[in-house]
Amino acid sequence: VAAQIVDEGVCSMEDVDRGAKVGLRWARGPFELMNKVGVQESFEMAKEYQSLCQNVDEKSSWSIPDFFFKQAENDTSWDFSYVDTQINDGIATITINRPEAMNALNETVVNQLGIAVKAVNANESVHTIVLDGAGKAFVAGADVKFFVDKIRSDSIDDIVEFTSNGHKVLNSIENSPKITIALT
């Protein structure tokens, strides 16, 4: 059903997950759960569900969306986008879009933010960068859960790498040749 919502253009995969986590208070959204279980296994479950959705004329009343079929066929996890970029009239708005975690910075967000900043800095038609955060917070800071998980798993090198990469991204924002504004 989550895949059908995305397939019908109701909202994005990230929005479906966010809605489940915020609205239903799930620990993980449906697409995150599919990644955890495995997209292939999730697809097999969806096929079983589809077989239960038979009308009187033996035709299915629900079908698995093509993009879910292709994802399962490739046997790859879903990729989530937590940084959105829009460019209008030379102004690039980069929105950190992880409001369910107060836009806290984790590895994925920092990497995606770095890619977005690099792209708009290289874009000659952009003269201004506006940084924004979706939801109630601009950015809550680093995701503390990341640090706790890495300390518990004795992965201190991951913390050092994350911190180093975070500094590089923040320095690229600070040293941008573009006018840079943060909306808080």
Residue map of PLM features:
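Conserved CoA-thioester-binding segment of acyl-CoA-metabolizing enzymes
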Residues: 73-136, 148, 157, 164, ...
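Short, flexible, mixed-charge acidic loops at enzyme active sites
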Residues: 141-148
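Short glycine-/acidic-enriched loop or helix-start segments at secondary-structure transitions
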Residues: 12, 140-141
